[in-house]
Amino acid sequence: MSPVEIRDLERKAFQAWPALETRANFGWVQRFAGGYTKRANSINAIEAGAHFTPAVMAELERPYRERGHPPIWRLSPLAPAEADAVLAGRGYRRIDQSLVQRAPLDERFSPDPVVRIAASPGPEWLAGFAGLSPVAPHHRETMAQMLRSIAAPVGFASVEEGGEALAFALGVVDGDHVGLFDVLVAPAARRRGLARRLTQSIGAWGRDHGACFAYLQVVATNIAALPLYADLGFETVYSYAYRVP
């Protein structure tokens, strides 16, 4: 995937999971969301050839330290080639190697009658989603604020059985792509194909809203999800990792 294509997909993902505040400096985007998720509280290159000097590093990290948060660097292929080694030399740990995957929305993506997709997150959806996610109680309002601030067409998907919510996921359309985020299944309901049904339904929903491709971000060690995504035609187009103090 070319740098231009990577930048476009990065932009789509940023808008699909919006931070509460963003700043663009020196070819990097600083994202802030009160410490809720690394994705929304990280420093990200948005241009090939982004500046990376000691002075630039200090300036990019400063607002995080002032807020009492660790400066988290998210290194995609757009980051300067030396960034990973420089941060490692400063003692920053490399964590959560992740894959960005994409698939054409072909016949493998079809709506499932058990999957409900709403245009806005109601209180029950938010409570159920938060209950299955690792979000800390003090971050739940931030999470809700971020979800409500998504400007693109969004589908809040869920599966219920006997009045009990068993699974959730999020789909966000931007042009010809739909992003799939945070597929969560209750422990007691796993290994029943609910993640597949959510993924297929969100893909079909995205296609109905003009998308031709689905994309997602998945941790490279997620051995439960990777075979499912491969079966649905997802292929890795690039990867990224975090460096944290």
Model-derived segments and spans:
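Conserved active-site alpha-helix within GNAT-family acetyltransferase domains
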Residues: 80-94, 196, 220-239
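Short amphipathic alpha-helix that is part of the acyltransferase structural core
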Residues: 1-10, 39, 44, 98-99, ...
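Conserved GNAT acetyl-CoA-binding A-motif
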Residues: 67-76, 206-217
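Conserved acetyl-CoA-binding loop-helix of GNAT-fold acetyltransferases
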Residues: 53-61, 182-187, 191-204, 208, ...
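Conserved beta-strand in the GNAT
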Residues: 26-33, 93-95, 100, 158, ...
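N-terminal charged segments
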Residues: 1-66, 79-80, 138-139
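A short helix-loop-beta-strand connector motif used in the catalytic cores of GNAT acetyltransferases and
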Residues: 15-21, 69-70, 83, 95-98, ...
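Acyl-donor-binding surface of acyltransferase catalytic domains
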Residues: 49-124, 137, 243
